[in-house]
Amino acid sequence: MAISKEKKNEIIAQYARHEGDTGSVEVQVAVLTWEINHLNDHIKQHKKDHATYRGLMKKIGRRRNLLAYLRKNDVNRYRELINSLGLRR
């Protein structure tokens, strides 16, 4: 199941840097993190769902690249985001 519009708007409201912000790195990483967590739960139940596993790996790679970009350009924002999302970095 894809992320609902209400849930996505809730995540955007929490991580947006300013009014109307939907594309900042923080928002993108937060949405990807929610999707990754959701797919992890699905994979635990359906171990042979290889198509979903591939999609999960693509999302993890996308999040990794966005976090590397943020770390390179603004370490303080990177650390705040990692702490607020509870990621292991």
Swiss-Prot record:
The gene is rpsO. It comes from the Bacteria. GO terms for cellular component: cytosolic small ribosomal subunit. InterPro entries: Ribosomal_uS15, Ribosomal_uS15_bac-type, uS15_NS1_RNA-bd_sf. The lineage of its organism: Bacteria, Bacillati, Bacillota, Bacilli, Lactobacillales. Keywords: Ribonucleoprotein, Ribosomal protein, RNA-binding, rRNA-binding. PROSITE patterns: RIBOSOMAL_S15. The keyword DNA repair does not apply. GO terms for biological process: translation. This is Small ribosomal subunit protein uS15. NCBIfam families: S15_bact. SMART domains: Ribosomal_S15. Gene3D superfamilies: 6.10.250.3130, S15/NS1, RNA-binding. Belongs to the universal ribosomal protein uS15 family. It holds the Pfam family Ribosomal_S15. GO terms for molecular function: rRNA binding; structural constituent of ribosome. Part of the 30S ribosomal subunit. Forms a bridge to the 50S subunit in the 70S ribosome, contacting the 23S rRNA. One of the primary rRNA binding proteins, it binds directly to 16S rRNA where it helps nucleate assembly of the platform of the 30S subunit by binding and bridging several RNA helices of the 16S rRNA.
